[in-house]
Amino acid sequence: MYRAVTRQIEVLVEPEFLPERSSPEKQQFFWAYSITIVNGGPDSVQLKTRHWVITDGFGQQQEVRGEGVVGEQPVIGPGERYEYTSGVPLTTSSGFMTGSYQMVTEDGEAFDLAIPLFSLDSPDIRRTLN
């Protein structure tokens, strides 16, 4: 599990390689990642936008920006948590991701909530020549 804390708000990430959605012979590798955001602060916050930096095994980066997560812009109250799962494809068998969420407080103050750098690793895949 990967963890980052910003302003008493914790972001936990659990990546998982999905062999059933991957085709190594076609250079297609797929991971799911589960995110838990825990508001340990005194104020409610709303997740407005996301920004991801995805790096493949060759060091090539792709940036993804968008509104909310999985179609939602959740409000997370003090002591509450929000969880979701999404996925990412790569053309290499490993890589990593990091990023941030733009959060807004009840007073309208915007700040970036850090998403920890996490690794995308697939198990060793042995190739057989026939």
UniProtKB/Swiss-Prot annotation:
Any matching Pfam family: DUF525
Gene3D superfamilies, per database record: ApaG domain
Domain ApaG span(s) in chain numbering: 3-127
Superkingdom assignment: Bacteria
A single GO BP: error-free translesion synthesis
Disulfide cysteine pairs (residue numbers): none
HAMAP family in the cross-refs: ApaG
PANTHER family reported for this sequence: F-BOX ONLY PROTEIN 3, POLYMERASE DELTA-INTERACTING PROTEIN 2
Protein's recorded name: Protein ApaG
Species this chain originates from: Afipia carboxidovorans (strain ATCC 49405 / DSM 1227 / KCTC 32145 / OM5) (Oligotropha carboxidovorans)
